[in-house]
Amino acid sequence: MPKPPVAEVAETEQAVEPPPPEILEPDAALSPEETEQARRDYLLTRFWISGKGFWGANGGKLAWAFSIGLIFLIITNVAFQYAINVWNRAIFDAIEKRDSASVFYLTGIFFPLAIGSVALGVFQVFARMGIQRRWRAWLTDSVVSRWLTNGRYYQLNLVSGDHENPEYRIAEDLRVATDAPVDFVSGVISAFLSAATFIVVLWTIGGALTLTFGGSTFTVPGFLVVAAVIYAAVTSTSMVYIGRHFVAVSENKNQAEAEYRYALTRVRENGESIALLGGEEEERDGIDKTFASVIKQWALLCGQHMRTTIVSQGSSLIAPVIPLLLCAPKFLDGSMTLGQVMQAASAFTIVQSAFGWLVDNYPRLADWNACARRIASLMMSIDGLDRAERGDGIGRIQRGETEGDAVLSLNDLSVTLDDGTAVVEEAEVIIESGERVLVAGESGTGKSTLVRAIAGLWPWGDGSVNFHPDRRLFMLPQKPYVPFGSLRRAAAYPAAAEDWTIEEIGVALDKVGLGHLKERLEEEAPWDQTLSGGEKQRLAFARLFLHNPDIIVLDEATSALDAKSQDKMMELVNKELPNATVVSVAHRVELEAFHTRKIVLERRKGGAKLVSDIDLIPRKGKRRLLSRFLRQRKTGREANER
């Protein structure tokens, strides 16, 4: 089970610098609010570090082509808007003059304009969603690749940080985080071009407004433009002020939703244990608490939406009326035609909408902010694991090659937690080909942690773990993983099901006592729920015999089996894989009979230490003696059964 080096991670992620010190270790000089704001600001920066690679990666030319095409379509669409605005003036002037010929002529012109505008809108949606789809696919591939590299998905469970529910962040938050920016950028470009175009229209049509107040006369040049700017400034400022807590509330809501889903998932995944223990009431209490948090956050979000709706809804009602009221004096004194009034009203609405883009998009902007930060938090936690594997900060366990006849060696190996707390201290072990080594010790002495360090899943510590370069490692955990799909796929995992024939997999199932499932190898079912704990462990041994590795690591791999079944599995390991090297972690004393050495870990103040390395069977002739012992044990057991 070799682990790819960190250098193989995507180039776009290699250059990520550590976050500022105040993010990793809060500065006493900063208030909690300032520290939190610094963290939020960095998270957005971290998101863009990952996200911008889409335009420079393989396929970046296509991304740029879609982006440039989208901008071109937006510009063309604004041009059509201007043409329709001019048509609006002409049609109302013709109606005012009761010019039927012009009305019919302009009606004929309208249909090509409408068809062109609709076509542009359709192509604009295609380009916009094309960018969103491709960006999401690219960033998802990048995040999932890093999440699945070097066991990061597992290591995240071992370290502190804001990375809970990574599956929800990848599936949902990442979708929002890539969809919204494309909408925002296209919206801003459209708003800017629309504002620039129709401000000219307002300035040209409206001209200056002369006001008399207190005997004094005032002239306001471009009064319609001034009114549009003032109105947009008031509504935007009101929206920013009223919605200033929207981002935090939206982020808390998303987190509460994720925790609620996780609580429900836990019940489904552990249904048997909960049912056997009668823990329904306790689980209901936990679910109710997480759901109460969801309702509380939804209530807060509802309040935010209600406040921002006051501004957005009020603006949408008032905006069309203002230009009519402002143009009414000029229309009534005959200095402005009906067509000019309608053109000005349309232009004012477009300008106000452009200036009020923030008003209309503030809630979604807040939601994007929260989702982007959740993705960035996940990436930042993975960054920390990468730094740990490179040896930045606390020590890193080195991985190398053995010398001489050794298949596996631990050289001055110390294993620590991610904060530097010692778990295992200064382990020195050399294991030769064909040895069966049992790692024993009290619960909590770090046996499983030591095994994870050997397998490469635990990077924190010092010293080195060395393997023979030509030997393959295979690990059997206490809870074997059963993937979705057919039983054939589950038996072959992590290799492809097609790597072995149905007959070969059937033989392996026969060996481990699962022959009754041979006829169901191609059946797709929820096998993780169908198989018992013991059957899953038998299936794991079937995988082992199919893969035929050189080094086997067993981490409580027979804990769900009865003594007879356990003996059978261990006898099969010795029979089917006589030359393999085995390292086992177990509590059952009976397993000593299947091993040639026992390493004992003992808890000490500075971390567990290897206090004894015992030969269970003399090394000279150990395989012959072990084989004889196992035959005698089996014969005696059969006699007792008779």
Language model features with spans:
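Membrane-integrated ABC transporters
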Residues: 1-81, 90-110, 124-128, 154-192, ...
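Short intracellular "coupling" helices and adjacent cytoplasmic loop segments at the cytosolic face
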Residues: 30-36, 98-100, 130-133, 143-170, ...
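A hydrophobic transmembrane-helix motif
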Residues: 72, 76, 83-85, 116, ...
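Cytosolic ends of transmembrane helices, especially the final helix of ABC transmembrane type-1 domains
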Residues: 131, 243-247, 258, 273-279, ...
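Primarily ABC-family ATPase nucleotide-binding module
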Residues: 162, 276, 379-438, 461-469, ...
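An intracellular "coupling" helix at the cytosolic face of ABC transporter transmembrane type-1 domains
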Residues: 172-178, 248-269, 275-322, 364-367, ...
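ABC-family ATPase nucleotide-binding domain "signature/switch" substructure
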Residues: 453, 490, 523-624
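Conserved "ABC signature" C-loop
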Residues: 480-526
